[in-house]
Design a protein with these regions (language model features):
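Beta-solenoid repeat scaffold
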Residues: 54-100, 115-131, 157
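Acidic Gly/Asp/Thr-rich repetitive segments characteristic of extracellular carbohydrate-active
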Residues: 25-62, 403, 589-597
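C-terminal outer-membrane/trafficking sorting elements
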Residues: 454, 571-614
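Short, T/G/N/S-enriched strand-turn elements that build extracellular solenoid repeat scaffolds
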Residues: 44-52, 67-75, 113-115, 296, ...
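Sec/Tat signal peptide C-region and signal peptidase I cleavage site
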Residues: 15-19
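Predominantly extracellular beta-rich ligand-binding scaffolds that present long acidic/polar faces
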Residues: 70-80, 155-157, 181, 187-190, ...
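A short, polar beta-strand/turn micro-motif
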Residues: 420-445, 468-532, 539-574
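Right-handed parallel beta-helix
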Residues: 121-231
Length: 614
């Protein structure tokens, strides 16, 4: 009997741990117990006893508009609220007076979650999926369409926050009419925050906290657009907290006022209690009007990788008041005007493209920001992104863009996969050409690129063809190209600057050749009628000459500069010519490593060295 009692108790405990599925419709149907769609529970009935259900229960909401009660209950258990994935959307609306606009008489909050759990504690995991939050009219402190407080983990997926308005403006307890997140860990995936409006402190989203271990927010594949606030973040206000992660996301076309601290994303600086670290990766922040795209106070802490941040050219892309605590780049970014009030510790990489000339128009042209750039080189490869994610301890999926499109092995920076900026060069019948570009690029099929590592006084060059087809060529590489006659198009790439030992230099436009070496002479790539293709003086006595755009030239100093030219027929490839068989010693092999009986015409290997037998 004792054994049976224990077994029964175990069964009862186990059954209590299983989640129950409930089905909800606006008015309910059948028996209204939520056991099926035919017996769906009415929304108002569900709300009236929301905390009587078991932690982990799942609520499926039929498509339709759910008008929230006048006083929204505080939800203290971990549930899943799942709206319709097809057909009529599931909408939580605050439009109580049914006039179609947020105003007096409408609800100030649509859902309030307060789980009383620590950061990362998923014992009360709350999931929101496929729900639109709209029509909240915030006219009191600490309210929002979605308010989350003191909750260790809330996941919000494929939700829309549209046309929520905040008119409250007292005691700094305002802003964030779409989402007010307090001392919580919230992850947004595939969500949209559009057309929300606040007097200030976050046109759509406000993040705040009260402790050193709380306040972590992540946006992955999200769109924040069309929101308004007079100051302190037309899109996002990062007040207090530890981390704000913007990944594979777009923040665009939000509107600030004209006075005060104005910008799309605003953050107070780091301090002992609040790290306030912003991480922007694989994201696009562009086309926001009024102030900077990203604005930070003293001690701002920002990390950026493989992203695009550009304004209209009249205001900064990034503006940091006084000296920031950290502006760390992992490279592969396109950044517009960068403004810091005092000297900073910004560590831009040579793979970053930072220029005041990078603007909304120059990068996106006639494209909407959501359609991706028209003039961006490739950014980081997937291998490079994985290294960055590991270094920054990011556990997010970086393999897809905001639309769920695969980034493949390589893609342009920012949130949207798009065609990369292209470069061009031609190779003639001579099978040689030179090429230089400020960006890196992918070597096309059938072409190899070499650096000149040495020049001999007798007029020969040592060329290392280290960049084969498909390889990534570093930025600012001046190369000798060898391949079949053709006009080639190359995909340009943000890449670290070349550190190759190379006597070739180049220019991105028509410019005079230069060198830091005393007595250096300059050689132009040309086809000499007597000596053939090679590098020859481009001006009298090897003086400087005007080099063509995207072409390489040769710089030689020292004894070898006595040579007037270096014909490519005299390139030192490491292969020696042998015509006297009697001087050969040792076993003879072909290039496939097979031993030969005696010398045969062509290239062979003797004692580890290559020889040409004629």
């Amino acid at each position: 009997m004792k054994r049976f009692t224990l077994m029964l108790a175990g069964v009862l405990c186990a059954s209590a741990s299983f989640a129950t599925d409930y089905y909800v419709s606006v008015d309910g149907s059948g028996e209204k117990n939520g056991s099926s769609w035919e017996n769906a529970i009415a929304f108002t009935d569900m709300c009236s006893k929301i905390n009587e259900y078991q932690n982990g229960d799942v609520f499926y909401f039929q498509g339709g508009t759910y008008y929230v009660p006048a006083k929204v209950p505080t939800v203290s258990n971990g549930y899943s609220f799942i709206g319709a994935s097809t057909g009529t959307p599931t909408v939580f609306s605050g439009d109580v007076n049914c006039d179609g606009v947020p105003n007096e008489g409408d609800a100030s909050s649509l859902l309030f979650i307060q789980l009383a759990t620590k950061n990362g504690d998923d014992s009360k995991l709350f999931v929101l999926k496929n729900i639109t939050f709209t029509g909240a009219y915030v006219n009191q402190a600490k309210t929002s369409a979605l308010r989350v407080d003191n909750s260790g983990r809330v996941d919000v997926q494929n939700c829309i926050f549209d046309k929520n308005v905040s008119v409250y403006s007292k005691d700094n307890n305002y802003g964030g009419p779409a989402c007010l997140l307090e001392r919580s860990t919230v992850n947004f995936t595939d969500c949209k925050f559009i057309n929300n409006e606040s007097i200030g402190r976050g046109g759509a989203i406000k993040l705040t906290s009260d402790g050193a271990t709380k306040g972590y927010t992540t946006f992955n594949r999200c769109l924040v657009s069309g929101n308004k606030a007079s100051s302190l973040g037309s899109a996002i206000f990062f007040n207090h907290g530890q981390e704000l992660n913007i990944i594979n996301s777009i923040v665009a076309e939000n509107n600030s006022g004209t006075e005060g601290e104005i910008g799309a994303i605003f953050s107070i600086g780091a301090e002992n209690k609040y790290a306030r670290q912003i991480t922007i990766i694989n994201s696009t922040i562009a086309g926001n009007m009024g102030g900077a795209q990203v604005l930070g106070r003293k001690n701002a802490a920002i990390r950026i990788a493989n992203s695009i941040i550009v304004g209209d050219g009249t205001t900064p892309a990034i503006s940091l008041q006084e000296k920031p605590k950290l502006v760390l780049s992992a490279g592969y970014n396109i950044i517009g005007m960068y403004q810091v009030d005092e000297a900073s510790t910004t560590a831009w990489k040579t793979s970053d493209f930072v220029s005041d000339n990078n603007t909304l128009n120059s990068i996106f042209g006639n494209n909407a920001v959501t359609n991706g750039p028209v003039a961006a080189p490739y950014g980081a490869t997937q291998v490079q992104m994985e290294a960055i994610a590991k270094d920054w301890s990011l556990g997010q999926n970086l393999k897809q863009d905001i639309n769920g499109v695969s980034r493949g092995d390589i893609a342009v920076p920012g949130a949207v996969v798009a065609e990369p900026l292209k470069g061009k060069f031609g190779i003639t019948d001579a099978k040689y050409a030179t090429y230089y570009h400020d960006f890196g690029y992918i070597m096309p099929e059938g072409v190899k690129g070499g650096v000149v590592t040495d020049a001999k006084v007798e007029g020969t060059l040592v060329v290392d063809y280290k960049y084969g087809s498909g390889s990534v060529v570093p930025a600012k590489s001046a190369l000798l190209l060898n391949g079949a006659k053709n006009n080639y198009e190359v995909a340009l790439k943000l890449e670290e600057t070349s550190e190759d030992v190379n006597l070739l230099k180049g220019t991105s436009d028509e410019s005079l050749t230069t060198s830091d070496e005393a007595g250096a002479k300059f050689y132009k790539f040309a086809n000499d009628k007597d000596k053939g293709i090679g590098f020859y003086w481009g001006a009298d006595n090897g003086a400087a000459f005007t080099n063509s755009a995207n072409k390489a030239y040769l710089v030689v100093a020292g004894e070898a500069s006595a040579a007037k030219g270096f014909a490519l027929g005299g390139v030192d490839t490491g292969i020696k010519e042998v015509t006297e068989v009697g001087k050969m010693a040792g076993k003879i092999y072909n290039l496939q490593g097979m031993q030969q009986k005696g010398l045969q015409k062509g290239i062979c290997i003797v004692n580890g060295k290559k020889f040409v037998v004629k």
